[in-house]
């Protein structure tokens, strides 16, 4: 396994700072401790406490929010990282793999990536994501504007993004932007949030660890088979493309490859949410522990004494009632289920990381660590299938998701006058903070948060010297990003209340 040197991957350089050096182990550790402080103290992490995990607008604090889920993922990620490093130590590979001064940073990068992994998610989870994409797809008609030549079927509602005869280069840009704006994705928004909006100036290694997918949002070409898993979702937007190119150079990553520690973050998320969703469903009385056991055993098939299902789920179920008076049967069951599941899946994830280390290190390993034909992965899949069949399609969940979809779609409708303004008028509104001819738009603009307005202004200034046609296209792009940034950054409750206020429903 020559060629594996984690010093080439774990870079402590920052995009907005001068190149720095750190010689001893503690100096390197301090750099990543600074990352921890920036992340933990960021507003994006605080907002996770009022964002949906499964149950939107949940008042029961025992049911998980995105924040409590992320804390659980952080702990599992730390455990997997420690397991991997311990195996490297036992095999006397620490120095050979360039990790002798990077043990603490290795763990810290994984932990903080786990804590951050959901910060780009909009209100109401995947339904909020769908609402944003559906709203923009209807107006962008990305498939009607593919390529460089106008099509008779093109139904784009934005004049500046309509393809025009004889404008090949501009049409390619228009097509890119139409696809990009129609592909809002929480993982891509996380990259935008930490770099362009919050400007946390994190190390390249720390941000590389949350670059879960490697496809740009504007991508419309066929996906290469060698990377069809890594590119199954958008990983970053056109707005952050230059930054991602810098990151790849700094971390020695080929195009479409992944940062090696990202595989650990992904495995920790898979392990954590599969148990959490089921525990929350029991807390919400969607089914009982006994019913849950029946659902899981049906998905597993024939259970034989000593198989993995029996050791993990069966062993937890057999503990019911054994500690009456000390804890409830539900708490008892999930305590043992969690311990048993983590105890089996964490070593399996660590082993998969090590067995596939050359491909994992290069970032070309085209699957998840917990995606193979093993009994451990079968167990994980049955947890997920039970959640899909019996939790996500529960009437209460579906009703709240429909409400969330309507809220996000409605907010986009409400703020759409800002997108309909001519470029010159919007530019004047930004410069003067008001526009006499656009009183409604002025008031909507005032509701946007300062950090989002500043990010737009900075982007607009950066493209100021482009030819006028290019400038108008990019200006609209960053204006649309401004609206997406603002609405996707809301908490569930704020989005719900804002929608009601602006619809005069209260």
UniProtKB/Swiss-Prot annotation:
- Write one Gene Ontology MF term: magnesium ion binding
Q: Check the record and name the SMART domains matching this protein.
A: HDc
Q: Which CDD domains match?
A: HDc
| HD domain boundaries | 66-274
Domain of life from the UniProt record: Bacteria
Quaternary structure note: Homotetramer.
Role played: dGTPase preferentially hydrolyzes dGTP over the other canonical NTPs.
Name-wise, this protein is Deoxyguanosinetriphosphate triphosphohydrolase
């Amino acid at each position: 396994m020559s060629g594996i040197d984690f010093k080439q991957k774990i870079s402590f350089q920052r995009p907005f700072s001068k190149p720095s050096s750190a010689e001893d182990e503690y100096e390197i550790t301090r750099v990543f401790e600074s990352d921890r402080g920036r992340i933990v103290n960021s507003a994006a992490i605080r907002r996770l406490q009022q964002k949906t995990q499964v149950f939107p607008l949940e008042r029961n604090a025992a049911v998980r929010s995105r924040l409590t889920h992320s804390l659980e993922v952080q702990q599992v990620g730390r455990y997997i990282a420690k397991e991997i490093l311990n195996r490297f130590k036992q095999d006397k590979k620490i120095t050979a793999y360039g990790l002798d001064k990077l043990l603490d940073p290795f763990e810290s990068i994984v932990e903080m990536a786990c804590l951050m992994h959901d910060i780009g998610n909009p209100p109401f989870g995947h339904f909020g994501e769908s609402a944003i994409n559906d709203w923009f797809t209807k107006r962008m008609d990305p498939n009607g504007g593919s390529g460089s030549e106008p099509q008779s079927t093109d139904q784009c509602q934005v004049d500046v993004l309509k393809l025009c005869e004889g404008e090949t280069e501009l049409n390619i840009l228009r097509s890119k932007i139409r696809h990009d704006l129609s592909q809002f994705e929480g993982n891509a928004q996380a990259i935008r949030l930490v770099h362009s909006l919050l400007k946390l100036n994190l190390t390249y290694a720390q941000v590389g660890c949350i670059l879960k997918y490697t496809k740009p949002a504007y991508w419309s070409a066929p996906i290469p088979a060698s990377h069809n898993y890594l590119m199954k979702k958008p990983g970053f937007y056109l707005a952050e493309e230059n930054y991602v190119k810098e990151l790849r150079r700094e971390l020695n990553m080929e195009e479409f490859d992944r940062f090696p520690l990202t595989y650990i973050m992904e495995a920790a998320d898979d392990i954590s949410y599969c148990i959490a969703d089921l525990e929350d469903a029991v807390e919400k009385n969607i089914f009982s522990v006994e019913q849950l056991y029946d659902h899981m055993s049906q998905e597993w098939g024939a259970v034989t004494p000593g198989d993995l299902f029996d050791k993990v789920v069966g062993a937890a179920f057999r503990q019911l009632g054994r500690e009456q008076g000390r804890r409830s049967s539900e708490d008892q069951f999930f305590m043992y289920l969690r311990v048993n599941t983590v105890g089996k899946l964490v070593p399996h994830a660590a082993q998969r990381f090590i067995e596939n280390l050359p491909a994992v290190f290069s970032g070309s390993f085209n699957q998840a660590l917990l995606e193979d034909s093993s009994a451990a992965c079968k167990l994980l899949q049955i947890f997920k299938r039970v959640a899909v069949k019996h939790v996500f399609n529960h009437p209460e969940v579906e009703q709240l998701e429909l409400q969330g979809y309507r809220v996000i779609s409605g907010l986009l409708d409400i703020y759409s006058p800002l997108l309909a303004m001519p470029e010159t008028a919007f530019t004047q509104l930004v410069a003067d903070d008001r526009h006499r001819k656009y009183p409604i738009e002025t008031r909507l603009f005032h509701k946007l948060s300062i950090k989002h307005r500043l990010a737009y202004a900075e982007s607009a200034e950066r493209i100021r010297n482009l030819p006028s046609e290019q400038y108008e296209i990019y200006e609209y792009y960053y204006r649309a990003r401004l609206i997406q940034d603002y609405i996707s950054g809301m908490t569930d409750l704020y989005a719900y209340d804002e929608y009601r206020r602006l619809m005069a429903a209260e």
